[in-house]
Amino acid sequence: MLFDVLRSFGVRCAGFIPLGDADLISKREYGFPEDAFVISFYLPYYTNVKSNLANFASARDYHQYYAELFRACESFMNEKHPGRYFRGFADVSPFAEVLLAAKCSLGVIGDHGMLITKDASSFIVLGEAVCGLSEDELLAEGISKGEGKVGGCTHCGECRRQCPADAADDKSRCISSITQKKGELSESEKDIIRKTGMVWGCDVCALACPVTKTAMKNGTLETDIPYFTEGRLGTVDEGLISSMSDEKYERYSFSWRKREVMIRNIRIASGTDFEGENI
């Protein structure tokens, strides 16, 4: 089954809705079949590692893993359903991924804007695929039919209360956003990095969620996918980032920015401002 292929990569559940019910955010013409369905699924990535990187950033770049997953799915489709349409996306997607996943009944949308799943909370990376199989064929391939409804969280307010940057009402203050910015940061932005010590991304709002605490207690939060458990980075410093070969640096998702950005963040977090150029 198609779901067996997904499961072999660590996908725990997958759902689908008609293409017409999915929210497109791209004006690009992709040539999708009008009667196609969109499948949504996710990979859990959390491990209990102490780091000044967000949990996803301490693991190897998930985009590369998704590329392998999609190649395996395409091979399966070519063998079992030759000529049928299949195209996968992850992160760089024509769809509003969180909204799509919620409509596919994979979870609910939290006040922090991320999907919350029962087993892995928000420590997931989403993927989706446009597929030319019929509804009955998708069900036979082990993919569940989504309800098409968007549910919200319980609005307990923990993510808002625990955010160290008070970013609930001003996303420009979010540490994840600030640490990925190019150029010179404002003093208020630098203060946020100094306050938290984080040099790429942040997990505070996701860790604050009661669903995360329940998943942790139940033993479902941590991933068992070797790609995400092996090669993890702990606390990084300037020496480590500077000494990485280009090949190793590019294994991690923060490599979409030049390493000067990481070094800037590390210096700010350690209390030494970096007056860099061409960052």
Stretches with model-predicted labels:
Residues 158-179, 197-225:
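Iron-sulfur cluster-binding cysteine motifs and their immediate structural context
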Residues 255-273:
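Long, compositionally biased charged/polar accessory segments in the mid-to-C-terminal portions
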Residues 165-189, 230-236:
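Active-site-proximal loop/short-helix segments
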Residues 141-154, 192-202:
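Immediate flanking context of iron-sulfur cluster ligation sites
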Residues 1-152:
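Auxiliary alpha/beta "docking" domains used to position bulky ligands
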Residues 245-248, 274-279:
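Amphipathic alpha-helical scaffolding segments comprising HEAT/armadillo-like alpha-solenoid repeats
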Residues 213, 220-236, 240, 251:
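Extended alpha-helical surfaces
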Residues 244-257:
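Acidic, Ser/Thr- and Gly/Pro-rich intrinsically disordered linkers and low-complexity segments
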